């Protein structure tokens, strides 16, 4: 079966349906995946880029973005190699004011039991995440 690495621009055209020709082509590709004719591979970086574009350029609400992308990741014909971490990160993103990358780090740290080395005090919001002891240095 044919597999495609999904570029964020195709994902965005499908989600936004904002360009007659490109959105239609994207919808056709997603339909092929849903019909089992191909597999679309959505990477964690593709999700991160989509989150950034949808929230910064298109000014969509965090909750809307997180829910739309979470639904996308579990669709038939879509593979996300880091699905559990990405879904956890989207849940954290929706429920906090942390940026998506920090939410992804928190998801990875929680799943692996590895502490996060960061000066970002926002990560303290995630009770299931251990942070590096910065030796009394104030986190920013």
Question: Where are the language model's segments positioned?
Answer:
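Acidic, PIN/NYN-like endoribonuclease modules and their adjacent C-terminal/linker elements
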Residues: 3, 107-140
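A generic structural signal for short hydrophobic patches within well-formed alpha-helices
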Residues: 11, 47, 123-124
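Active-site phosphate/pyrophosphate-handling residues
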Residues: 9-10, 51, 103-104
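Amphipathic alpha-helical segments within well-ordered protein domains
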Residues: 51-55, 70-73, 90
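Short, well-structured N-terminal submotif of metal-dependent ribonuclease cores
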Residues: 1-42, 57-67, 137-140
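Active-site neighborhoods of divalent-metal-dependent phosphate/nucleic-acid chemistry enzymes
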Residues: 77-117
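Residues that scaffold the ATP/ADP-binding catalytic core of kinase and kinase-like folds
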Residues: 13-15, 53, 126, 134
